[in-house]
Amino acid sequence: RCPWRERLLQGEVHDDNAWLIGGVCGHAGLFGTARAVGLEAASWLRCFHGESTSSLISTDVAQWMMSLARRAPMKGSFVLGWDTPSPGYSSAGQYFTRHTVGHLGFTGTSLWMDLEQRILMVILTNRVYPDRNRSQSIQGIRWLRPQIHNEIWRLIQ
């Protein structure tokens, strides 16, 4: 239940700040189907490697971003708006390389792309359904994300 709109949300952005400015905002999480998010992320990966173009980013910008990700410090940081894994305990889990960029969402969504290994993972969840006021929901998703990523890595290795 959204406190601002005073109803359950379905099929619309849940991020309050994005909603306040019209529903589309770069900081907000992922909104779409897992297939659609995965296909767009795959096009970004190809774009990073100069193999194609993306509707959302030019090849030049993608390759510049990839070079920044390769030089990102070992501690968690951001690369042109993308998150990088934090050492020690990252929502990406323990198997993504330091040449990885990703994005997390308020509702528990997650996208990580390993630019070197060309592996991407998408998790779409709604931890705030039906009510964001459950105190365990944020701790639960922080625990769950790396568990899912680690298990997928174990399955594909």
Model-identified regions with their sequence ranges:
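Catalytic loop of the DD-peptidase/beta-lactamase superfamily, centered on the K-T-G motif
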Residues: 1-157
